[in-house]
Swiss-Prot record:
Homodimer. Belongs to the OMP decarboxylase family. Type 1 subfamily. It comes from Campylobacter jejuni subsp. doylei (strain ATCC BAA-1458 / RM4099 / 269.97). This is Orotidine 5'-phosphate decarboxylase. HAMAP family: OMPdecase_type1_B.
């Protein structure tokens, strides 16, 4: 299980400072939509200069198939290690993205977003007319069949996804509150024990790390646990 630290701070300077504090730790960094829009692709280069961190660019790409493939191709030129697209974009979009990325000698891992961890059952059903678990199983089967590397899901769907695909089909699980911290805007949250029991491959932790007075110590504690 790998730790992915979410760089969701208010400024680029704060993100870079956090990154410097975490230098030499065996972690991934997650760059989200706000940071990428604010700081651009040069921010990725700056992160790579701090240390040889693996970068997950969390843009949740969702558009028509050709536009998605174009976007993923451009992102791949930046040396990104992992990206994500929305599973609800469908199998044609998935196929176009994977075909386009196949020309790279070292392409990024591509994950599909299933049900955002900010959803509870009621709100999810109001949009998709399905229970979360049913939709996630369907999304994961389509993603697996069309060559993606894994899924973004809550901890509670991770094991189910592997049961309906393969054990090596990756799961990245946001909404991790490692030591029982408050949920904030997340609905389907879990701790480290739950993540381990449900076979998560990557856990995403943000606020419990960067809001702490000693982010490095928290990261080290998490790494010891996993």
């Amino acid at each position: 299980m790998k730790l992915c630290v979410a760089l969701d701070l208010s400024t680029k300077e704060e993100c870079l400072q956090l990154t410097k504090e975490l230098k030499n730790l065996d972690i991934w960094l997650k760059v989200g939509l706000r940071a990428y829009l604010r700081d651009g692709f040069k921010f990725i280069e700056e992160l790579k200069k701090v240390d040889d961190f693996k970068i997950f660019l969390d843009l949740k790409i969702h558009d028509i198939p050709n536009t998605m493939a174009d976007a993923c191709e451009e992102i791949s030129k930046l040396g990104i290690d992992m990206i994500n697209i929305h599973a609800s974009a469908g199998k044609i979009a998935m196929q176009e993205v994977m075909t386009r990325l196949s020309k790279f000698s070292k392409r990024p891992l591509v994950l599909a977003v299933s049900a955002l961890t900010s959803f509870d059952e009621e709100n999810f059903f109001s949009i998709y007319r399905q229970k979360i678990e049913e939709a996630v199983i369907n999304f994961s089967k389509i993603s697996y069949e069309n060559g993606l590397d894994g899924m973004v899901c809550s901890v509670f769907e991770s094991k189910i996804i592997k049961e309906h695909t393969q054990k090596n089909f990756l799961t990245l699980t946001p909404g991790i509150r490692p030591f029982g911290e408050k949920n904030d805007d997340q609905k389907r949250v879990a701790n480290l024990t739950m993540a381990r029991e449900n076979l998560s491959d990557f856990i995403v932790v943000g606020r419990p790390i960067y809001k702490d007075n000693n982010p490095r110590k928290i990261c080290e504690k998490i790494l010891q646990e996993i």
